[in-house]
């Protein structure tokens, strides 16, 4: 089966740790590199700007590094974000960005953005529940963050494609995934931090947190959703290990973490690992996505269509944005 093909780029790179300006510069360079490789969409990993806070798995409280982290996080309405949007427009490429969002109260959130080839911010959301030790740094998302799929217009034979994204272990939340499927995504970006292979069957480390376990979750999302999945991971080399002092901790102990890949709608891996599987290697994984295969797989499994039983099982959703201050309504005056 053959249909219109969309070339995509999946980054596998080390962030500029805790350096907002350096992070934006590297992001712009990777956007340009992906466009030169004829990609129409480029994906970045979880917390790409300014890097995933690996120290939380070594020591949960570090006010010095945490302060620097907040100061180097990215605001949605900022000159830095405008620079990234301009790079998307100049290179005529869609950008799916993982970043740490800072707000004016100095709280930070694990966030994602989808930017069109025209430089428009089509979607911005926050991870609805940070995972385990991440809660020492990040706040929760809210109802509006359940909208995680956007229409991206690539023009030509491709036209409009529904592109969605989730962060890390959001791929282990069945109800959130089902709501994502209901938005009819055709391409899904699964964002992950640097992840290492599991040390062995007798090790106490969770297999579900390993490179193998995380890829399994991405492949499951592809099968259940009938969508292409761009499995995007970051890299952490000595610069990150030394800078965050993670040696001897649960994660980020050795250079590596990179396992980016493209996954087909039936769950198969489409691409080979970079540099013969060297997880410390930086680069870009490219893939040509035959969009007709989405249709073919949906014909077999459509979990929000013909392969569902809404008369028996259904999902309730509250998309309202929750605020800390809710003004009390004044009673209406009798006329």
From Swiss-Prot:
Enzyme nomenclature, EC number: 3.5.5.1, 3.5.5.5
Catalytic activity: a nitrile + 2 H2O = a carboxylate + NH4(+); 4-chlorophenylacetonitrile + 2 H2O = 4-chlorophenylacetate + NH4(+)
InterPro entries: C-N_Hydrolase, C-N_Hydrolase_sf, Nitrilases_CHs
Keywords: Hydrolase
Any one Gene Ontology molecular-function term assigned to this protein's record: arylacetonitrilase activity
Enzyme superclass (EC): hydrolase
Domain CN hydrolase: 6-291
Pfam families xref list: CN_hydrolase
Thermal properties: Optimum temperature is 45-50 degrees Celsius.
Main function: Nitrilase that hydrolyzes preferentially phenylacetonitrile, (R,S)-mandelonitrile, and 3-indolylacetonitrile.
Similarity remark: Belongs to the carbon-nitrogen hydrolase superfamily. Nitrilase family.
UniProt name for this protein: Arylacetonitrilase
Originating organism: Arthroderma benhamiae (strain ATCC MYA-4681 / CBS 112371) (Trichophyton mentagrophytes)
């Amino acid at each position: 089966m053959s249909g219109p093909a969309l070339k995509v780029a999946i980054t596998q790179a080390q962030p500029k740790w805790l350096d907002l300006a350096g992070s934006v510069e590297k992001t712009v360079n990777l956007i340009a590199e992906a466009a030169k490789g004829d990609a129409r969409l480029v994906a970045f990993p979880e917390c790409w700007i300014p890097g995933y806070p690996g120290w939380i798995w070594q020591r949960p409280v570090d006010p010095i590094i945490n302060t620097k982290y907040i100061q180097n996080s990215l605001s949605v309405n900022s000159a830095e974000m405008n620079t990234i949007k301009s790079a998307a427009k100049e290179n005529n490429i869609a950008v799916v960005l993982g970043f740490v969002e800072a707000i004016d109260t100095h709280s930070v959130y694990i966030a994602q953005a989808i930017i069109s080839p025209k430089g428009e911010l089509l979607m911005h959301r926050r991870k609805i529940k940070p995972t385990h030790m991440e809660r020492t740094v990040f706040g929760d998302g809210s109802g509006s963050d359940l909208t995680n799929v956007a229409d991206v217009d690539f023009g030509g034979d491709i036209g409009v494609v529904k592109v969605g994204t989730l962060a890390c272990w959001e791929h282990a939340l069945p109800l959130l995934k089902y709501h994502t499927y209901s938005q009819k995504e055709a391409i899904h970006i699964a964002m992950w931090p640097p992840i290492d292979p599991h040390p062995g069957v007798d090790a106490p480390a969770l297999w579900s947190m390993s490179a193998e376990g995380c890829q399994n979750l991405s492949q499951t999302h592809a099968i259940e959703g009938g969508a292409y999945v761009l499995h995007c991971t970051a890299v952490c080399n000595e610069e990150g290990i030394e800078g965050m002092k993670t040696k001897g901790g649960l994660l980020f102990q050795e250079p590596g973490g990179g396992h980016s890949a493209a996954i087909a709608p039936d769950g198969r891996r489409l691409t080979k690992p970079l540099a013969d599987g060297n997880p410390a290697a930086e680069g870009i994984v490219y893939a040509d996505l035959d969009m007709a295969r989405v249709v073919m797989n949906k014909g077999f499994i459509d979990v929000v269509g013909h392969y569902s039983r809404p008369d028996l099982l259904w999902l309730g959703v509250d998309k309202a944005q929750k605020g800390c201050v809710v003004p009390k309504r004044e009673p209406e005056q009798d006329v």
